Amino acid sequence: MCIRDRDIFSLSQESLWLITVVYDLGLALLLYRFFGKYGLYVAVVLGIVLGNLQGGKVSELIIFGSAYKVSMGAILYSGIYFSTDLLNEKYGKTEANRAVNLGFFANIAVLLTLLLSLLFKPSDLTGSALEVHNALSVIASYSPAFIIGSLTAYFISQKFDVWFFNYLKTLTQGKYLWLRNNLSTIISQLIDTFIYTFTWVIATDLSIYDAFYIALSKYIFKIFIALIDTVFIYGVRNLNPLVKNDE
């Protein structure tokens, strides 16, 4: 029996949110297990690219009777912190920073490629060609201020996360993984959310009040994700990748 689209979307949005978080973190874990640090590089690139592509997909979740506006991109983007923290924990600060740099340049490359593709006129052979062209136009038509702000938020917050995680690890002599994982991520996400929200106000007609409301909702869920990924990072802490010569 086929499940209609409306039946799928009538499922609990809160359950779908949790499933997506577990899927995102689980994917990063599998990439690490089979490909080592290179798999985590891929996880970071996927997180930043897919997170930005789906940043405009906003849903409403009801938690304890309160409504929260949550971006789909925020879920995928938050998973990046799990990957960089795992890289930092297993391979060191240099490898974590390399993953951040790869994600930054990959995001620019995807954006430039989308812009180049829009220079080609869609064929009139089928109606779908125009539909795809218009869809790509929507994705690639963010204002320069929004793009610059998004990249800036990513780069600054991720660099801080890598540095602070390593600093806490040194300070605690390698103890209290839960502390450095959560504290570095929560503070870094606050930096990212602040820069991103400031960009929204500049690049759109969104009021400061609405921007703050959305930012607060996103930040609360980012904290939830940080708490969830603590379980994953402890689960994989003593797990070695299947590939050899992974150092």
Region annotations inferred by a language model:
Residues 7-20, 67-79:
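Structural signature of hydrophobic alpha-helical transmembrane segments
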Residues 1-5:
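Conserved small/polar residues in nucleotide/adenosyl-binding loops
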Residues 137-145, 149-157, 167-172, 180, ...:
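Membrane-embedded alpha-helical bundles of multi-pass transporters/translocases
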Residues 117-145:
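Membrane-interface interhelical connector segments
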Residues 43-60, 73-81, 110-115:
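A generic, lipid-embedded transmembrane alpha helix
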